[in-house]
From Swiss-Prot:
Protein name, entry field: Phosphoglycolate phosphatase
Stated family: Belongs to the archaeal SPP-like hydrolase family.
GO MF entry, a single one: magnesium ion binding
Residues at which substrate binds: 150
Biological function: Catalyzes the dephosphorylation of 2-phosphoglycolate.
Cofactor(s) listed in the protein's UniProt record: Mg(2+)
Keyword Magnesium belongs to the record: yes
Length: 226
């Protein structure tokens, strides 16, 4: 198996524990002979800035698969779903004290501060018959459509790049990386990953955070995956 591209999460995967970028893995990205695609729950402006500063492709997956960009100056592909997320938020606000994050930049989901129990939010939605997904990435709580995730985002990016999803090495640390790992050709979780990411991965690094991502790349190279 020789993979043709890397799709990788940002927070907790190529960052340090303080959320600063790991400069060693950023440098390694620029040395590779395959495209590196950032895939994140963050809004498009954030991930484009990160890609530009790192010096890699402007092809990115943002908002957990809800927004796809094929380049820094290219039109974005934006999924439906923001309206149903807003309706869920309005309902949840009647029962819980919620704080929105980055809402002016969000096109497909509603993101909340992590000061409320996710299970309580899910129970409220279930009791009111609302079919929408709520995930906690360890950095924020995302209210999102069940129809989109980083896996569906990878499917679209692969199509746009003329590749198969199985041509990608996927690297991540969180529950929202699991679907991406499942549809990719090979998935690696860094050592600080949560249980969902670990279950979806085929290999777990010994190192955590950005050093784990660097280890994942070296593992793939030494085992003929890249």
């Amino acid at each position: 198996m020789v993979l043709k591209a890397i799709v990788i999460d940002i927070d907790g995967t190529i960052t340090n524990p303080d959320r600063s970028l790991d400069l060693d893995v950023a440098k390694r990205f620029r040395e590779l002979n395959v495209p590196v695609i950032l895939s994140t729950g963050n809004p498009l402006c954030y991930v484009h800035a990160a890609a530009k500063l790192i010096g890699i492709s402007g092809i990115v997956i943002a908002e957990n698969g809800g927004v796809i960009s094929t380049g820094f100056d290219s039109p974005s592909i934006i999924a439906d779903g923001k309206e149903e997320c807003e309706k869920a938020y309005e309902l949840l606000s009647q029962y819980h004290d919620l704080v929105k994050l980055d809402d002016a930049y969000r096109k497909t989901e509603v993101v909340l501060n992590r000061d409320v129990a996710v299970e309580d939010l899910r129970s409220t939605l279930s009791e009111n018959g609302i079919d929408i997904e709520i995930i906690d990435t360890g950095y924020a709580i995302h209210i999102k459509s069940t129809a989109m995730n980083k896996g569906t985002g990878l499917l679209k990016v692969a199509e746009l790049m003329g590749l198969e999803p199985t041509d990608y090495l996927a690297i991540g640390d969180s529950c929202n990386d699991a679907e991406m790992m499942q549809v990719a050709g090979f998935g690696i979780a860094v050592a600080n990953a949560d249980s969902d990411a670990i279950k979806a991965a085929r290999h777990i690094t010994k190192a955590s955070f950005g050093k784990g991502a660097l280890e994942a790349i070296e593992y793939a190279l030494s085992n003929g995956l890249l």
